[in-house]
């Protein structure tokens, strides 16, 4: 028989920097999961990634206090900001433009995000990324 699931925990944790302090400790502690075991496993799996890059993770907690976790791709907004070489998006995105990305950069981001996107094909994924960029005040050239 399969293990009984008691809940899902969704967190965004910097790659290679999971530690028992908030938000990780309290979220896992209230479900009775081993916090250090998760931190070691997460840090081991993210050591090849860029340190500090926020990684969304979904932790499945089971009744016997065990857990599994699935890591997603970094948020599109982080990748877009990196491609446009800016610190943050525009406070007024439709009037103040803060940067530019090309269609090729949008395609590269869409390719990386494809497993997590609901887009039917690559063109739809590129349009999704372009929409996110526009909502941040970044112009997408060639689209």
Swiss-Prot record:
Membrane-spanning parts = none
- PTM annotation, UniProt: One or more lysine residues are methylated.
Highest taxon in the source lineage:
Bacteria
What's any GO biological process attached to this entry?
Answer: translation
Per UniProt, the keywords (alphabetical) are: Methylation, Ribonucleoprotein, Ribosomal protein, RNA-binding, rRNA-binding
For this record, the Gene Ontology CC terms, alphabetical, are: cytosolic large ribosomal subunit
The record ties this protein, via SMART domains, to: RL11 (SM00649)
Q: Which PROSITE patterns match?
A: RIBOSOMAL_L11 (PS00359)
The molecular function terms of the Gene Ontology recorded here are: large ribosomal subunit rRNA binding; structural constituent of ribosome
Q: Which HAMAP family match?
A: Ribosomal_uL11
Q: Could you say which protein family the record assigns here? A: Belongs to the universal ribosomal protein uL11 family.
PANTHER family per the UniProt record, alphabetical = 60S RIBOSOMAL PROTEIN L12 (PTHR11661), LARGE RIBOSOMAL SUBUNIT PROTEIN UL11M (PTHR11661:SF1)
Q: What does this protein do?
A: Forms part of the ribosomal stalk which helps the ribosome interact with GTP-bound translation factors.
Task: Report quaternary structure and partners.
Answer: Part of the ribosomal stalk of the 50S ribosomal subunit. Interacts with L10 and the large rRNA to form the base of the stalk. L10 forms an elongated spine to which L12 dimers bind in a sequential fashion forming a multimeric L10(L12)X complex.
UniProt protein name = Large ribosomal subunit protein uL11
Q: What's the source species for this entry?
A: Polynucleobacter asymbioticus (strain DSM 18221 / CIP 109841 / QLW-P1DMWA-1)
Q: Which gene encodes it?
A: rplK
